[in-house]
Swiss-Prot record:
Positions contributing to (6S)-5,6,7,8-tetrahydrofolate binding: L112, G116, H117, L118, E237
Gene giving rise to this polypeptide: glyA
NCBIfam families for this protein: PRK00011.1
Residues modified to N6-(pyridoxal phosphate)lysine: K221
Role of this protein: Catalyzes the reversible interconversion of serine and glycine with tetrahydrofolate (THF) serving as the one-carbon carrier. This reaction serves as the major source of one-carbon groups required for the biosynthesis of purines, thymidylate, methionine, and other important biomolecules. Also exhibits THF-independent aldolase activity toward beta-hydroxyamino acids, producing glycine and aldehydes, via a retro-aldol mechanism.
Organism: Malacoplasma penetrans (strain HF-2) (Mycoplasma penetrans)
Identification of the protein by name: Serine hydroxymethyltransferase
Oligomer and partners: Homodimer.
Chief location: cytoplasm
């Protein structure tokens, strides 16, 4: 690296990733071969269109790698069709909407405050500006999806598309019930499985493909790949519409270096050790949930079936998530502040924090380490961010993470 400014920033970020406990639910650590592919010579190649149907010459090897990625994605998800070109999960959703909707059509999706995503019809997002969005939430008592209430709302709204899936929901999503609801009102069903796609591939969460018309996902998070997107379907009538909605509908040339990395991601997820990894992810979040509950914290939906959980700090300890996020980061523990269902506080100072287990499980953390994380979180909160407590735990974190090294051979 010749540019000294960027070299310093890259090395600082490398040290941060090596030295911190990463608990952001949407983050993970990719393998070194995925890092290598993302920085490969495919960065230079432009190739609008699809394999063997390009608008540029010189695409022989680009065609090979994209077809490999398509075939491997279809294999691991048991899908008839895969489009590996979306640049992100949001881009995948934008293309999915474009394939079946017209401007001002109605969609019904999970509300942002209840655990949905910006791209599910939020007013500040293109999805909410282009389509007429209504939102369902969770039951106020259980904080779980209420399928009878969603059915009733769907009958009233009469959407053309129902979106199921979330960015902050810790329980199993019943795709079969969503499929029945969508069918009963004549709507398409889109399953956004960005957070749980790794669990689906490993067999630890039901696959939506038998019930959903379209499935979208990111390829990072629990799939542990590059930051990108993917669209799947078993509905053969939608294949051409989806392809056209991605290119030329919402994107130009695909990022071939990222598609190369996506192929490696899908290949890694097809191995037996990936299934073991996902089981450990689930076990680790379960012990963290149990530890925090025993210490007096309210866990949203009373626990987790996947890789994440949300803590209601405000009702538990009369404190907000932004403060706890800051205190924990000072101790080298990274989480994100998050709204909880029916939150009485603002997005800038919400009642909760969201915690995920995927990244640190990649580094080798077990239930022992995740129990310790719960104890540290509690100790910092009980001290109200006392600098002495934070410094003590920061030193303990330093000792722990050194036992679980990553990217030892990388230096910029």
């Amino acid at each position: 690296m010749k540019n000294l400014i960027l070299k310093e920033i890259l090395n600082n970020e490398l040290k941060r990733q090596q030295g911190y406990i990463e608990l952001i639910a949407s983050e993970n650590y990719v393998s070194e071969q995925i890092l290598e592919a993302t920085g490969s010579v495919f960065t230079n190649k432009y190739c609008e269109g699809y394999p063997n149907r390009r608008y540029y010459g010189g695409c022989e090897y680009a065609d090979q790698i994209e077809q490999l990625a398509i075939d491997k994605a279809k294999e691991i998800f048991n899908a008839k069709f895969a489009n590996v070109q979306p640049h992100s999960g949001t881009q995948a959703n934008v293309a999915a909407y474009l394939s079946v909707l017209k401007p001002n059509d109605k969609i019904l999706a999970m509300g942002l405050n209840e655990g949905g995503h910006l791209s599910h019809g939020s007013k500040v997002n293109i999805s909410g500006k282009t389509y007429e969005a209504d939102h369902y939430g969770v039951d106020k008592e259980t904080q779980c999806l209420d399928y009878d209430a969603i059915l009733k709302q769907a009958q009233e709204v009469k959407p053309k598309l129902i979106v199921c899936g979330a960015s902050n929901y810790s329980r199993v999503v019943d795709f079969k019930k969503f499929g029945e609801i969508a069918k009963s009102v004549g709507a398409y069903l889109l399953a956004d499985v960005a957070h749980i796609s790794g669990l689906i591939v490993a067999g630890y969460h039901p696959n939506p493909l038998p019930y959903a018309d379209i499935v979208t996902t990111t390829t990072h998070k629990t799939l542990r790949g590059p930051r990108s997107g993917l669209i799947l379907t078993n509905n053969e009538e939608l294949i051409k519409k989806i392809n056209s909605a991605v290119f030329p509908g919402s994107q130009g040339g695909p990022l071939m270096h990222v598609i190369a990395a996506k192929y490696l991601c899908f290949d890694e997820a097809s191995k037996p050790e990936f299934k073991t990894y996902i089981k450990n992810v689930i076990d680790n979040i379960a012990i963290l949930s149990q530890t925090l509950k025993e210490l007096g914290y309210k866990i949203i939906a009373d626990g987790s079936d996947n890789h994440l959980l949300s803590v209601d700090l405000y009702s538990s300890k009369q404190i907000t998530g932004d403060l706890v996020e800051q205190w924990l980061e000072q101790a080298k523990i990274v989480v994100n502040k998050n709204l909880i269902p029916y939150d009485i506080n603002s997005a800038k100072s919400p009642s909760g924090i969201r915690i995920g287990s995927a990244a640190m499980t990649t580094r080798g953390f077990t239930t022992k380490e995740f129990k310790q994380i719960g104890l540290w979180i509690h100790e910092i909160i009980e001290s109200k961010g006392n600098p002495n407590t934070i410094n003590k735990i920061r030193n303990e974190v330093d000792l722990l993470v050194k036992k679980f090294p990553i990217y030892q051979d990388i230096k910029y």
